[in-house]
A protein has these predicted regions:
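A short, surface-exposed loop/turn module that caps and links secondary-structure elements
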Residues: 37-64
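Enriched for short, Lys/Arg-rich terminal
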Residues: 1-7, 15-30, 63-70, 74-93
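Generic recognition of well-ordered alpha-helical segments
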Residues: 16, 34-37
Length: 93
């Protein structure tokens, strides 16, 4: 039985981060795309040093895009959705 894929949604901050990432670290965009594909199937496990972040409420995780940039996202299991919070630099609240 195939599980349902998580829908990826971007916060306004994450949309800005994607623009910055494509300008300043275009090689990282390809890696980010692969991470997002993986997150659609299994958001809590996989590549990129998956880590649940303790300083946030709920299911907030991070994955390494590069040594300089982290992908931070919140998982909403009840609606099968992942909200990307940031994708440029390190953690932001």
């Amino acid at each position: 039985m195939k599980t349902e894929m998580y829908r990826i949604v971007f916060s306004n901050d994450a949309k800005k981060d994607l623009k910055e990432l494509s300008k300043k670290a275009p090689q990282a965009v390809k890696k980010l795309s692969k991470l997002l594909e993986e997150i659609q199937e299994h958001p809590r496990t996989g590549t990129g040093q998956v880590e649940r972040l303790k300083g946030y409420d709920g299911n907030v995780y991070s994955r390494r895009i590069t040594h300089e940039h982290k992908l931070v996202y919140r998982i909403y299991d009840e609606v099968i959705e992942v909200l990307v919070l940031s994708a440029f630099g390190h953690y932001k609240k």
